[in-house]
Amino acid sequence: MGAPELRDIGIRGDVVFGERVVVHRPVNLYGCVIGDDVMIGPFVEVQSGVRIGDRTRVHSHAFICEGVTIGRDCFVSHGVMFINDTFARGGPARGDRRLWKSTAVGDGASIGTGAVILPVTICAGAVVGAGAVVTRDIGVAGVYVGNPARLLKLLPEPGK
Protein backbone atom coordinates (compact mmCIF):
# COMPACT_ATOMS: atom_id res chain seq x y z
CA MET A 1 0.00 0.00 0.00
CA GLY A 2 1.20 3.49 -0.80
CA ALA A 3 1.25 6.58 1.35
CA PRO A 4 -1.13 9.43 0.46
CA GLU A 5 0.11 12.79 -0.71
CA LEU A 6 -0.85 15.19 2.08
CA ARG A 7 -1.70 18.78 1.21
CA ASP A 8 -2.22 21.57 3.71
CA ILE A 9 -5.06 24.03 3.50
CA GLY A 10 -4.58 27.67 4.26
CA ILE A 11 -4.12 31.01 2.60
CA ARG A 12 -1.76 30.86 -0.35
CA GLY A 13 0.54 33.78 -1.12
CA ASP A 14 -1.24 34.62 -4.38
CA VAL A 15 -4.41 35.90 -2.65
CA VAL A 16 -4.95 39.66 -3.02
CA PHE A 17 -6.63 41.19 0.03
CA GLY A 18 -8.26 44.61 0.32
CA GLU A 19 -8.20 46.65 3.51
CA ARG A 20 -9.76 45.51 6.80
CA VAL A 21 -10.55 41.96 5.67
CA VAL A 22 -11.45 39.49 8.43
CA VAL A 23 -10.78 35.78 7.85
CA HIS A 24 -11.85 33.13 10.35
CA ARG A 25 -9.61 30.06 10.12
CA PRO A 26 -9.46 27.36 8.95
CA VAL A 27 -10.00 28.39 5.33
CA ASN A 28 -8.65 27.43 1.94
CA LEU A 29 -8.02 30.55 -0.19
CA TYR A 30 -5.91 30.65 -3.33
CA GLY A 31 -5.52 32.81 -6.42
CA CYS A 32 -8.49 35.04 -5.58
CA VAL A 33 -9.12 38.76 -5.07
CA ILE A 34 -10.97 39.85 -1.94
CA GLY A 35 -12.21 43.44 -1.61
CA ASP A 36 -12.21 45.87 1.31
CA ASP A 37 -14.11 45.14 4.54
CA VAL A 38 -14.94 41.56 3.51
CA MET A 39 -15.59 38.84 6.09
CA ILE A 40 -14.75 35.22 5.30
CA GLY A 41 -16.08 32.63 7.76
CA PRO A 42 -14.43 29.37 8.83
CA PHE A 43 -14.29 26.29 6.62
CA VAL A 44 -14.70 28.35 3.43
CA GLU A 45 -12.92 27.55 0.17
CA VAL A 46 -12.38 30.29 -2.42
CA GLN A 47 -10.64 29.12 -5.58
CA SER A 48 -8.43 30.77 -8.21
CA GLY A 49 -9.85 33.59 -10.26
CA VAL A 50 -12.70 34.39 -7.87
CA ARG A 51 -13.39 38.07 -7.13
CA ILE A 52 -15.32 39.10 -4.02
CA GLY A 53 -16.50 42.72 -3.83
CA ASP A 54 -16.19 45.19 -0.97
CA ARG A 55 -18.24 44.68 2.20
CA THR A 56 -19.40 41.21 1.20
CA ARG A 57 -19.83 38.56 3.89
CA VAL A 58 -19.15 34.88 3.18
CA HIS A 59 -20.22 32.60 6.00
CA SER A 60 -18.96 29.20 7.12
CA HIS A 61 -18.72 26.15 4.89
CA ALA A 62 -19.29 28.06 1.63
CA PHE A 63 -17.56 26.78 -1.50
CA ILE A 64 -16.78 29.36 -4.20
CA CYS A 65 -15.29 27.72 -7.28
CA GLU A 66 -13.25 29.14 -10.13
CA GLY A 67 -15.15 31.47 -12.43
CA VAL A 68 -17.28 33.19 -9.77
CA THR A 69 -17.52 36.96 -9.34
CA ILE A 70 -19.45 38.30 -6.35
CA GLY A 71 -20.35 41.99 -6.21
CA ARG A 72 -20.24 44.52 -3.39
CA ASP A 73 -22.41 44.36 -0.27
CA CYS A 74 -23.45 40.76 -0.87
CA PHE A 75 -24.35 38.12 1.70
CA VAL A 76 -23.36 34.48 1.12
CA SER A 77 -24.79 32.34 3.90
CA HIS A 78 -23.58 29.09 5.46
CA GLY A 79 -23.01 26.12 3.18
CA VAL A 80 -23.64 27.87 -0.14
CA MET A 81 -22.15 25.93 -3.07
CA PHE A 82 -21.18 27.50 -6.38
CA ILE A 83 -20.77 25.04 -9.27
CA ASN A 84 -18.88 25.70 -12.51
CA ASP A 85 -19.12 22.24 -14.13
CA THR A 86 -22.43 21.55 -15.88
CA PHE A 87 -21.49 18.00 -16.91
CA ALA A 88 -21.82 19.16 -20.53
CA ARG A 89 -20.42 15.86 -21.82
CA GLY A 90 -22.56 13.68 -19.57
CA GLY A 91 -20.04 13.53 -16.74
CA PRO A 92 -17.56 15.65 -14.83
CA ALA A 93 -15.15 17.87 -16.79
CA ARG A 94 -12.25 16.25 -14.90
CA GLY A 95 -10.32 19.51 -14.74
CA ASP A 96 -10.94 20.54 -18.36
CA ARG A 97 -11.45 24.25 -17.73
CA ARG A 98 -12.75 24.76 -21.27
CA LEU A 99 -15.95 23.07 -20.12
CA TRP A 100 -16.40 25.20 -17.00
CA LYS A 101 -18.86 28.09 -16.98
CA SER A 102 -18.81 31.31 -14.95
CA THR A 103 -21.18 32.86 -12.40
CA ALA A 104 -21.76 36.53 -11.61
CA VAL A 105 -23.57 37.79 -8.51
CA GLY A 106 -24.69 41.44 -8.61
CA ASP A 107 -24.19 44.03 -5.88
CA GLY A 108 -26.35 43.67 -2.80
CA ALA A 109 -27.55 40.14 -3.58
CA SER A 110 -28.15 37.68 -0.74
CA ILE A 111 -27.85 33.90 -0.97
CA GLY A 112 -29.44 31.78 1.75
CA THR A 113 -28.07 28.81 3.67
CA GLY A 114 -27.39 25.69 1.64
CA ALA A 115 -28.28 27.20 -1.73
CA VAL A 116 -26.67 25.72 -4.83
CA ILE A 117 -25.71 28.16 -7.58
CA LEU A 118 -25.05 26.74 -11.03
CA PRO A 119 -23.30 28.88 -13.69
CA VAL A 120 -25.72 31.82 -13.89
CA THR A 121 -25.99 35.56 -13.50
CA ILE A 122 -27.82 36.84 -10.41
CA CYS A 123 -28.87 40.49 -10.63
CA ALA A 124 -28.23 43.19 -8.05
CA GLY A 125 -30.54 43.04 -5.05
CA ALA A 126 -31.83 39.51 -5.65
CA VAL A 127 -32.47 37.20 -2.69
CA VAL A 128 -31.97 33.45 -3.09
CA GLY A 129 -33.74 31.49 -0.36
CA ALA A 130 -32.24 28.78 1.81
CA GLY A 131 -31.84 25.48 -0.01
CA ALA A 132 -32.71 26.93 -3.42
CA VAL A 133 -31.06 25.55 -6.55
CA VAL A 134 -30.45 28.31 -9.09
CA THR A 135 -30.33 26.79 -12.57
CA ARG A 136 -31.18 29.88 -14.66
CA ASP A 137 -30.21 33.54 -14.72
CA ILE A 138 -32.02 35.82 -12.29
CA GLY A 139 -32.57 39.15 -14.02
CA VAL A 140 -35.19 40.82 -11.82
CA ALA A 141 -34.74 41.72 -8.15
CA GLY A 142 -36.92 39.41 -6.12
CA VAL A 143 -36.99 36.50 -3.70
CA TYR A 144 -36.26 33.16 -5.39
CA VAL A 145 -36.91 29.81 -3.70
CA GLY A 146 -37.14 26.10 -4.46
CA ASN A 147 -35.56 23.53 -6.75
CA PRO A 148 -35.31 24.82 -9.37
CA ALA A 149 -35.42 28.33 -7.95
CA ARG A 150 -38.49 30.32 -8.95
CA LEU A 151 -39.67 33.85 -8.25
CA LEU A 152 -41.70 34.05 -5.04
CA LYS A 153 -41.93 37.83 -4.67
CA LEU A 154 -40.70 40.91 -6.51
CA LEU A 155 -38.48 43.37 -4.65
CA PRO A 156 -37.83 47.05 -5.36
CA GLU A 157 -34.90 47.66 -7.65
CA PRO A 158 -31.76 48.46 -5.65
CA GLY A 159 -31.39 52.17 -4.98
CA LYS A 160 -35.10 52.95 -5.45
Question: Language-model segments: which ranges?
Answer:
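Flexible, glycine/small-residue-enriched loop-and-beta-strand segment within the central core
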Residues: 1-13, 23-122, 147-156
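Detector for the N-terminal beta1/A-loop initiation region of ABC nucleotide-binding domains
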Residues: 16
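C-terminal/domain-terminus segments
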Residues: 123-134, 143
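Phosphate-binding loop/pocket of nucleotide- and phosphate-handling active sites
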Residues: 160
